[in-house]
């Protein structure tokens, strides 16, 4: 999924005797919607780069088709050249990982276009070998070790310059308890522990109409309520440092990272009281492996699994064997299960349509093993009503705190906030893009680490900032010095102060902050003009001027619009050839 918000920003290129320009580059960025963080960024960087001798020739805010043809879909011949020859120099963009961080899919040297998504054209044998170890590590401590090694390499090499880690803002009832926020946006959190003292009903505002009703074919908006109905073998658990823990499975084990034996809780039942067993798991997984169902990650799943991969050992035990090692095999076990006795016989291509029909006419069919079940979908009034799953406590051990949960489609931000202020709504979705100063008094808000980051992607085949062959002291080390200089000239504090809508944290490496493997020991590249000039000089660029260096004195109109989220969400299991 891609949401893009950019605006063309005019600039004046500084030349003449005021500043010494060693070379010029071009900036590339999407131009979809106005008033984003890159509006602020572009105003600052075009003033800062000339201070270290880098001029801006052109800032190209273009549509995705144009951008794709200069980056991941470049038609050749390869490598992707600089901007003036049809490629790019620096590309301003945001990336996000839904769940599991897999940098090899972006930076492995074998995956440069046309073979993959490494449009950075970054090549480092040490990175490749470390990424191999990471992707084949199936013990969590080993993954953590290799993940931090990868971040150390990216921190040193800077194939891309990570600008910021944005946070999501959720306004909510001041007494809300039990919300573990990191996975809510990814529709990976169940609400059985949510509570507000003295309240038995919870209401949530969404900015989109209800459209998807089958849990294995849904988006974020419908995913948040469908997630309360269904359940998986494993889950990502914020209370376990965002690692995998058992849900419907009582245990899972592997001796080689390829074959997993899974024990299912024998007490688990569906919301109609029917026993949940291994045949339901087999049914769900074979559904996703059936081309007629058109599962969005079908290509990735069929790379590692076939129908023969799932073997039922007994009613509550099965074995799943992967055809080859993959990053995070547990991720396959976080898929929500659907009841075979409800869905068996429905044509594979008709699941989504059937789910919508049942939601409107017979909601008792929309059941899973989650804490809640569908009581009503009111199409005319635009709300979803969930009630407790009466069997959930019997196998899970505790009952959901709320008796009823409502999800309302509320069209505008102001309406949603007014409803929160009046007590009609208990929580407002982050997609309304609400600023801190808009949160009603008497309510609260939570800022949540996200799965995304903003960056300046570098063309590592650019002769100066990539290969360094055209630097006065030619070589890759000089290119690295130039990239370090650029990183130190980004005025992150100025940009954060000018943005004023969301809390941004300084970007360090291209790994999201909500990853359990994020290395918080790495230090940001603080703004330091002296250090930036020093790195330029190490690359052979000698500054002649001895005049005082101008300080940052930018006047930027505070942004009052959406938090841009110019983010391509990357599922490591599926190449996304163009944003949608």
Per-segment meaning from a language model:
Residues 17-19, 24, 29-41, 138-140, ...:
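Structural transition elements
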Residues 11-13, 37-41, 146, 150-164, ...:
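Periplasmic-binding protein-like
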Residues 18, 24-29, 33-34, 56-73, ...:
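Extracytoplasmic/peripheral linker and loop segments enriched in polar/acidic and small residues
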Residues 94-95, 288, 311, 375-387, ...:
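Extracellular/periplasmic solute-recognition and catalytic clefts
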Residues 205-255, 286, 367:
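N-terminal lobe/hinge region of extracytoplasmic solute-binding protein
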Residues 170-201:
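Long beta-strand-rich cores associated with HINT superfamily self-processing modules
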Residues 34, 190-193, 250, 255, ...:
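Aromatic-rich, solvent-exposed beta-strand/loop patch
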Residues 175, 298-351:
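Surface-exposed binding/hinge segments that line
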């Amino acid at each position: 999924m891609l949401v893009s918000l950019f605006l063309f920003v005019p600039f004046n290129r500084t030349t003449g005797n005021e500043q010494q320009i060693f070379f010029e580059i071009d900036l590339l960025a999407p131009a979809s919607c106005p008033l984003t963080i890159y509006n602020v960024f572009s105003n600052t960087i075009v003033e800062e780069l000339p201070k270290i001798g880098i001029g801006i020739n052109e800032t190209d805010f273009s549509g995705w088709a144009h951008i794709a043809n200069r980056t991941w879909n470049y038609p050749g011949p390869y490598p992707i050249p600089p901007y003036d020859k049809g490629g790019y120099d620096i590309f301003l963009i945001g990336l996000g990982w839904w769940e599991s961080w897999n940098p090899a899919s972006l930076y492995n040297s074998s995956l440069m276009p046309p073979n993959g998504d490494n449009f950075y054209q970054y090549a480092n044998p040490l990175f490749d070998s470390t990424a191999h170890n990471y992707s084949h590590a199936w013990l969590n401590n080993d993954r953590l070790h290799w993940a931090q090694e990868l971040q150390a390499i990216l921190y040193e090499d800077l194939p891309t310059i990570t600008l910021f880690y944005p946070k999501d803002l959720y306004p909510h009832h001041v007494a809300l308890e039990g919300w573990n926020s990191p996975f809510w946006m990814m529709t990976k959190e169940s609400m059985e522990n949510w509570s507000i003292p003295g309240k038995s009903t919870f209401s949530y505002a969404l900015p989109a109409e209800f459209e998807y009703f089958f849990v294995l074919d849904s988006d974020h908006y419908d995913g948040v309520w469908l997630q309360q109905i269904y359940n998986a073998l494993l889950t990502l658990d914020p209370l376990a440092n965002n690692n995998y823990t058992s849900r419907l499975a009582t245990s899972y084990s592997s001796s080689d990272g390829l074959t997993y034996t899974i024990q299912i809780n024998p007490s688990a039942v569906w919301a109609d009281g029917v026993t949940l067993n291994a045949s339901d798991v087999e049914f769900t997984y074979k559904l996703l492996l059936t081309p007629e169902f058109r599962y969005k990650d079908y290509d990735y799943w069929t790379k590692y699994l076939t129908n023969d991969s799932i073997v039922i050992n007994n009613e509550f035990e099965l074995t799943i064997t992967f055809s080859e090692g993959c990053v995070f095999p547990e991720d396959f076990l976080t898929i929500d299960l659907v009841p075979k006795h409800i869905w068996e016989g429905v044509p594979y291509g008709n699941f989504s349509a059937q789910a919508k029909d049942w939601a409107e006419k017979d909601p008792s069919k929309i059941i899973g093993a989650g804490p809640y079940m569908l009581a009503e979908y009111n199409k005319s009034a635009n709300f979803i009503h969930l009630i407790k799953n009466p069997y959930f406590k019997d196998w899970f051990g505790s009952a959901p705190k709320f008796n009823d949960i409502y999800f309302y489609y509320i069209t505008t931000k102001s309406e949603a906030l007014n409803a929160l202020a009046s007590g009609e709504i208990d929580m407002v979705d982050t997609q309304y893009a609400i600023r801190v100063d808009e949160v009603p008094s008497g309510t609260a808000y939570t800022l949540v680490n996200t799965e995304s980051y903003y960056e300046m992607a570098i063309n590592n085949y650019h002769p100066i900032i990539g290969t360094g062959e055209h630097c006065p002291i030619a070589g890759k080390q000089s290119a690295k010095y130039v990239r370090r200089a650029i990183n130190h000239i980004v005025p992150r504090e100025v940009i954060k102060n000018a943005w004023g809508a969301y809390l941004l944290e300084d970007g360090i490496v291209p790994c999201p902050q909500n990853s359990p493997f994020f290395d918080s020991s790495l230090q940001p590249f603080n703004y330091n003009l002296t250090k930036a000039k020093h790195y330029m000089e190490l690359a052979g660029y000698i500054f002649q001027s001895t005049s005082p260096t101008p300080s940052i004195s930018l006047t930027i109109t505070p942004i009052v619009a959406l938090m841009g989220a110019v983010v391509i969400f990357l599922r490591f299991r599926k190449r996304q050839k163009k944003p949608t």
